[in-house]
Structures are given as structure tokens and as C-alpha cells.
């Protein structure tokens, strides 16, 4: 499963094509951009949502119908949907994004990670990708030294 899908917090995945080189993947992606949105609603992604296998199968069929004929041979009609599971103990009912630029110290009980986000017990979430280059220290107050 591509890291990109995990970064976006996908709960289900279905590989629809396999190509011998990257340029073909780009051509398929350009065709599919016309019918599929390429934006992730980060708030919705941080909720517990079960995978929708039927929706993935229907999306594969839409892709098949809209893909240019010369790209059709690369489609994989028999792949089965995969479930992606993240290490999250619980999902808070309400979430609030926190930034290390505005709040340089973040503390609290970590419930898990999903996609690019760390999820804290109080509903705060931290987008790790937005903080590339930051130096952070992680401490466990219960650790015995």
C-alpha cells in the first residue's frame, strides 16, 4: 500500500492498476483526477470510520469506464479491498488542531496516530508533516530512569 494513502488516513484501499513505469501511472492519475476528488477532509479523517468495500469496488468501475482505452490493459479487475488499521486507542468526539509555532509545548496523553496526525486524549491533534524541521522531545512521565 502506498505511503501516500496511509498519510491521508485511508481506512480502505483498492489497487486498481499496475504499470511498468512511473510515466504511465501519471497518465492514469491525470485521467482519474477528472472524476475523483484529490482532497482529504482532515477532520473527517480523524474519526473512526469503517472501510466501505462496496464504494471502493464502485469507484474501480467508474475508473474503468472513464480511463482512456490505451490505459485499460493496466487495470486490475480482480484485486480485493484492503483494510488499513491505525494505532489509535480511541477517537475523541471533537478535535482541535494545534501548531507548535503558536503552542511551543504540547503535553498530554497520546491516544494514537492516524495519517499524518498525532491524536491526544483531550481532542487536540498535531499534524506532523506541518512541523518538518522542528526539533521535538518526547517524554514519558511514568518512565523509570
Language-model segment annotations:
Residues 1-11:
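GIY-YIG-like beta-to-alpha core
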Residues 11-105, 112, 124-145:
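Short glycine-rich, low-complexity segments
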Residues 1, 108-110:
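OB-fold and OB-like beta-barrel modules that bind single-stranded nucleic acids
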Residues 116-120:
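Short aromatic-glycine-enriched beta-strand elements
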Amino acid at each position: 500500500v502506498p505511503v501516500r494513502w496511509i498519510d491521508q488516513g485511508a481506512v480502505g484501499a483498492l489497487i486498481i492498476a499496475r504499470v511498468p513505469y512511473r510515466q504511465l501511472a501519471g497518465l492514469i492519475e491525470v485521467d482519474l483526477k477528472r472524476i475523483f476528488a484529490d482532497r482529504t477532509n482532515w477532520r473527517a479523517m480523524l474519526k473512526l470510520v469503517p472501510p466501505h468495500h462496496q464504494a471502493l469496488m464502485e469507484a474501480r468501475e467508474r475508473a474503468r469506464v472513464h480511463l482512456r482505452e490505451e490505459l485499460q490493459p493496466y487495470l486490475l479487475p480482480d484485486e480485493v479491498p484492503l483494510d488499513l488499521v491505525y494505532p489509535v486507542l480511541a477517537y475523541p468526539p471533537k478535535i482541535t488542531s494545534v501548531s507548535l509555532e503558536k503552542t511551543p509545548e504540547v503535553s498530554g496523553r497520546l491516544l494514537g496516530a492516524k495519517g499524518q496526525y498525532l491524536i491526544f486524549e483531550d481532542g487536540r491533534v498535531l499534524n506532523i508533516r506541518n512541523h518538518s524541521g522542528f526539533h521535538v522531545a518526547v517524554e514519558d512521565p511514568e518512565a523509570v530512569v
